[in-house]
Amino acid sequence: MSKYNKSIKEASSISDINKSNWSSINPNYVARMRLQNEFKTGIDIAKYTASIMRKDMEAYDLDSSLYTQSLGCWHGFIGQQKLISIKKHFGTNKRKYLYLSGWMIAALRSQFGPLPDQSMHEKTSVASLINELYTFLKQADARELGGLFRELDGASDNDKSEVQSKIDNFETHIVPIIADIDAGFGNEEATYLMAKQMIEAGACAIQIENQVSDEKQCGHQDGKVTVPHAEFLAKLNAVRYAFLELGVDDGIIVARTDSLGAGLTARLAITNEEGDLGDQYNSFLDVDEISESNMKHGDVMINRKGKIVRPKRLQSNLYQFRKGTGEERCILDSITSLQNGADLIWIETEKPHIGQISAMMDEIKKVVPNAKLVYNNSPSFNWTLNFRQQVFDAMSESGDDVSSYDRDDLMNEKYDDTKLAKLADDKIRTFQADAAKEAGIFHHLITLPTYHTAALSTDNLAKEYFGSEGMLGYVANVQRKEIREGIACVKHQNMSGSDMGDDHKEYFAGDAALKAGGKDNTMNQF
């Protein structure tokens, strides 16, 4: 039996459906509304998407070309349009996720107005955006299915089976989300409470970083401060307990390390014996070996293999790591997280360089062979300059003539048509596939692309509309393109739910329904 017919049968079997005082309730309409609202709660979504993500992780282990991707979205509408576009262009949304960026929540969704990425925004704003994203995606399901139901009603007997097949094989817009909890917004109890709220909103994957919560910085800014492993592992446990309490047993934890760019620690790690995790953490500290006679009032000392050393402490009461230890600390962080409950790791880097990433992953995989990475293809990188410089360096090392290029000025558009620039663009084009194969990257994401696309498209419209083009600036560059490129939002009344509203009015009021989609609706021009 088809999915649609099964739904009709189930609706028809409702015990009260045939009572005389329910005579106006149509089981077909009930069946349609149920299919349009497959996911009743955020927990339903989290369970469904966690299962998808786990299967994707298993598939990637067998074939690295099956990596996954996402774009950061700061509003439900943006996430909805992304998934509608993916289905339109590729016919499926398999291995395409959502990403929720703490940076964009801070910059765009706080009631305080725009904030830096320092965990100053409201804790509840994260779960609120997750809920908003899935509300819009559920509406995308209802809208598309509503169109198919109307198509079914108008189809000839010969065509009905084809339309019903589309309904039965409908692919939902609901996809996994990787959601940023920053450093947990407080202690482990605060982390647990916030994670629980995020899961209840639909999150199947939570990303948490090893920075100090109240000193948190954007991963691509200076002044980052990490915490000893024991504190971070307690927060991983808090997130896992939140998943398990809510019945999302296969929820995913992404453990992010910021150690590559973090030169400071808030505290010395507790160590009970040489070589334990606390001792390994402290071994990266920048210290001075001193004698007892050189001790000063207020000094903090460590006994390291029988020698007394003094960690370098700043006026901020933070301790300094030795320079050049970032990669080693990232490797230790990642191995430790994977051995203590994390499913995926995230190493925040200062540049998009496959060699750098793969070198760290090679060391991690010696201990955890199936280690997988989530990687931030960050807009904070100047991708053009980075890859042109990488190509410049490779050409120089191989003996090619690079005398016509200025390495520090390779962003200049005068180089756009050169061999170097084209080679760099080729490397950017294949970066994700290459990194998935060579560096163990399971998931590629861009944290805040839609922040930038909103700014760019608005700038272009403002330039044309308020300039000499006037109304043509909108018509030629927006509406005409929407029509010709099949952008669903050109019929904005339909996208906002007007046609679904008309369907419901007919369900509820029958022939007395006052509908918005009549002959005088200007959307008929499209």
Region roles according to the model:
Residues 446-451:
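Short acidic/histidine-rich active-site segments
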Residues 5-439, 445, 469, 509-526:
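Alpha/beta enzyme core
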Residues 384, 452-453:
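A SIS-like phosphosugar-recognition module
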Residues 355, 455-456:
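Extracytoplasmic/secreted cell-surface and envelope-processing proteins
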Residues 456-457, 469, 503:
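Gly/Ser/Thr/Ala-enriched C-terminal appendages of enzymes
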Residues 476-526:
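C-terminal functional modules
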Residues 466-472, 483:
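Mixed-charge (polyampholyte) low-complexity IDRs
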